Amino acid sequence: MKGFIAYIPAGFPDLETTRKVLLALNDLRITGVEVGVPFSDPVADGPVIQLAHSVALRNGVTMKKILEMLREISVDYELYLMSYLNPIVNYPEGKDRLLDELRRLGVKGLIIPDLPLREVKNIEISFPIVPFVAPNTRDEDLEAINTIRAPFVYYISRYGVTGEREDLPFAEHIKKVKKKIALPLFVGFGISRHEQVRKVWEIADGVIVGSALVRIMEESKRQEIPQKVVARVKELIGEK
């Protein structure tokens, strides 16, 4: 099996459920989990994940509370923090204090949807940042990725916002990008079926699934969410 990263929005429907989901996922052979930090203007996200952000914010979920929750768990998979730039640079105790805490927690990298690829090298954040690549990324920018310290590259397999879709466009471009970069290439945005996961595994190093998991969380009773998420991930990776 190739790589699989799950996106789990922190605080949806509450932080205790998030904690249980993260622990339940530890029983699976997955690469990692992106823990999503809620933000009031999640411009890169579709309606399913936007709703999760809104619920978490109404619950009073903050970056600080998310870190407190992460301190309570121990998992074998890789942890990533997905956050818009604002909650990072405006962390109450300072950005550097936040990064120190992430290091102590063993977080492998930051995923910042509103940070353009060209700004990744310029921003003053001394922490691995996962760069985004899209179908319209220029060749010179692809080559620059090899100078960035990052755990992997996040390929956006569609234009616009996150969400589920049926087809898998840009397969040829994904192959082209894979040849040009030295870092592992993970494909996200719109992956919702095992057939799509299998197709991505044929041409890239892994997949990232978000909306399909958040939708299951939205449709399930609170106490059933951890087992429902695990079952959905098993279905996606083809594990019985």
UniProtKB/Swiss-Prot annotation:
Gene Ontology MF: a single term: tryptophan synthase activity
InterPro entries the UniProt entry points to: Aldolase_TIM, RibuloseP-bd_barrel, Trp_synthase_alpha_AS, Trp_synthase_suA
Keyword Amino-acid biosynthesis assigned: yes
Catalytic residues as annotated in Swiss-Prot or TrEMBL: 34 (proton acceptor), 45 (proton acceptor)
UniProt keyword Lyase, yes or no: yes
Alphabetized UniProt keyword annotations: Amino-acid biosynthesis, Aromatic amino acid biosynthesis, Lyase, Tryptophan biosynthesis
Pathway terms, separated by semicolons: Amino-acid biosynthesis; L-tryptophan biosynthesis; L-tryptophan from chorismate: step 5/5
Disulfide bonds: none
Alphabetical list of SUPFAM superfamilies matching this protein: Ribulose-phoshate binding barrel
GO cellular component term, pick one: cytosol
Catalytic activity: (1S,2R)-1-C-(indol-3-yl)glycerol 3-phosphate + L-serine = D-glyceraldehyde 3-phosphate + L-tryptophan + H2O
EC numbers, comma separated: 4.2.1.20
UniProt cross-references to CDD domains, sorted A to Z: Tryptophan_synthase_alpha
Function: The alpha subunit is responsible for the aldol cleavage of indoleglycerol phosphate to indole and glyceraldehyde 3-phosphate.
Entry similarity comment: Belongs to the TrpA family.
HAMAP family attached to this UniProt entry: Trp_synth_alpha
Record note on quaternary structure: Tetramer of two alpha and two beta chains.
NCBIfam families hit by this protein: trpA
UniProt protein name: Tryptophan synthase alpha chain
Organism phylogeny: Bacteria, Thermotogati, Thermotogota, Thermotogae, Thermotogales
